[in-house]
């Protein structure tokens, strides 16, 4: 296990001692990115590699894809095997991206305007035997899978559309393959996924409207309000808290660190569990379970360490585990690794 620098460890420990405590041993799974396109397909990935894009440097670009019915069924099959001492199954808080680009409409308008489609329409386009929405409903009814709000879209619309108009990095070739940007920067990250990275007041107004629209679409699709939300990549302007609250959000999921986007600069803001701002409570993730990134055994051991540390400090164990860990349409071995690791983790904690 790689240890953080001392100052970072100290800072994290200090924050973890602040705020809400409990003697109860709660374990919470939070999983981001459901409903969103990342890599469109295995064939698209192969073509992009052949074009020279360094997609292998990013585990998300080379493994993550829109979830299929098979992906969800296998995840639910693991969850339903386990119960706590009260007879409750583990439940995944699944943070949904509500829409994806409508590629045909955008192309028809020659990249002059952005158009989107709700994620269930994307399911219909992707999967011939489209049973994904049915399985999501089964997961909700079985208290195994509970949707919450992530974003309307998980990419920066302004940056992406500008890149399409200018064909930056051959973006239109990637667009034709059904991908939402796969330009990998020198750190191995995707430059387009920071959805709330506003550079101007106009962009911030657009983001505010996207949150309003996204939360209303969430209610229309699922039939209940999302009481929590999480900003993509933990990056948002704190003025957006008022928008979240106005639309019924009571708590923001997140990390110890918020990256606040203030146009041309980014500020780092510390948060602790139970902190309140503009009527919004903060929930802070203090455990990591990412077998796709870390490998199965390391991911299990790291998560168990984090859980024990959370309990030692009188905190619930709030586990971050992204969708990519359970997706097998592009790389079947990735899903096998993720689900096997989840099975081992649950055997240890249930």
Task: Please state what every model-predicted region is.
Residues 324:
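Short, glycine-/Ser/Thr-/acidic-enriched flexible segments
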Residues 2-228, 233-282, 299-321, 329-350:
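Catalytic alpha-helical scaffold of carbohydrate-active enzymes acting on polysaccharides/glycoconjugates
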Residues 287-288, 292-294:
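A conserved mid-domain beta-alpha-beta active-site/ligand-binding segment of alpha/beta enzyme cores
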């Amino acid at each position: 296990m790689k240890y953080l620098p001392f100052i970072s460890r100290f800072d994290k420990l200090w924050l973890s001692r602040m705020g809400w405590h409990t003697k109860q041993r709660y374990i919470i799974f939070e999983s981001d990115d459901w409903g969103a396109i990342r890599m469109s397909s295995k064939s698209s990935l192969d073509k992009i590699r052949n074009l020279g894009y360094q997609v292998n440097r990013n585990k998300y670009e080379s493994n993550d894809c829109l979830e299929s019915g098979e992906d969800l069924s296998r995840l639910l099959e693991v969850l339903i095997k386990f119960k706590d001492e009260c007879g409750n199954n583990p439940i995944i808080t699944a943070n949904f991206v509500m829409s994806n680009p409508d590629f045909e409409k955008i192309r028809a308008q020659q990249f002059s305007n952005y158009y989107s489609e709700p994620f269930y329409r994307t399911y219909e386009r992707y999967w011939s035997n489209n049973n994904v929405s049915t399985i999501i409903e089964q997961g909700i009814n079985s208290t195994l899978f509970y949707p919450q709000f992530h974003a309307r879209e998980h990419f920066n619309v302004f940056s992406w559309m500008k890149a399409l108009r200018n064909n930056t990095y051959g973006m239109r070739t990637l667009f034709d393959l059904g991908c939402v940007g796969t330009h990998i920067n020198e750190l191995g990250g995707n430059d387009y996924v920071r959805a709330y990275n506003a550079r101007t007041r106009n962009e911030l107004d657009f983001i505010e409207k996207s949150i309003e629209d996204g939360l209303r679409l969430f209610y229309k699709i699922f039939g209940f309000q999302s009481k929590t939300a999480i900003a993509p990549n933990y990056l948002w302007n704190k003025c957006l808290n008022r928008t979240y609250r106005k639309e019924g959000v009571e708590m923001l999921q997140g990390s110890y660190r918020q990256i606040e986007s203030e146009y041309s600069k980014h500020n780092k803001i510390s948060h602790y569990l139970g902190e309140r701002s503009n009527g919004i409570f903060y929930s802070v993730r203090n455990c990591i379970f990412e077998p796709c990134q870390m490998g199965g055994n390391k991911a299990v051991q790291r998560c168990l360490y984090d859980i024990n540390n959370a309990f030692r400090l009188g905190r619930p164990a709030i586990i971050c585990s992204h969708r990519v860990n359970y997706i097998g349409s592009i790389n079947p071995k990735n899903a096998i690794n993720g689900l096997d690791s989840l099975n081992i983790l649950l055997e240890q904690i249930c």
